[in-house]
């Protein structure tokens, strides 16, 4: 199992990752950073997310998670010491107990409804700030990196 299991997500200010599950996410401004950070590492995602991002994933091992797949079994098959969990909300929730880091990039949008970062209830966890990366200075967009301390 990887020593670093990183949730990576662009979110709106009200905590949504998309307006609906099949949205082609054109509103995010962090795609170049996503590509840089995930290059050479396995990226785990659900099939809807894969459908919306497939053109952006060249050069990466992509693991598509299906409804009945066991997150622990998937992670045990990963040979790399680092992998990224790239959505959607159901996948983030299912892999939540295994996360070691959160890379969250808030964007200046409010959707009001849509796909939440975690579609299911997750347990409380303490997160510790580790790093801040500038994504788009003109729009005030930064990626916040946290270490997760599961309770």
Predicted feature descriptions by range:
Residues 1-151:
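Enzymes that bind and transform nitrogen-containing heteroaromatic metabolites
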């Amino acid at each position: 199992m990887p020593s670093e299991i990183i949730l990576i997500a662009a979110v709106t200010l009200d905590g949504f990752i998309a307006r609906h599950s099949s949205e082609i996410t054109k509103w995010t401004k962090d795609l170049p950073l996503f590509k840089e950070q995930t290059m050479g590492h396995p990226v785990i995602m659900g099939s809807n997310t894969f459908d919306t991002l497939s053109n952006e994933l060249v050069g990466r091992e992509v693991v598509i998670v299906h409804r009945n797949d066991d997150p622990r079994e998937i992670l045990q098959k990963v040979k790399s010491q680092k992998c990224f969990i790239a959505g959607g909300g159901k996948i983030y929730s299912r892999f939540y107990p295994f996360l070691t880091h959160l890379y969250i990039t808030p964007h200046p949008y409010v959707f009001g409804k849509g796909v939440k970062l975690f579609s299911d209830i997750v347990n409380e966890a303490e997160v510790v700030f580790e790093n801040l990366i500038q994504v788009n200075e003109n729009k005030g967009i930064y990626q916040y990196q946290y270490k997760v301390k599961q309770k």
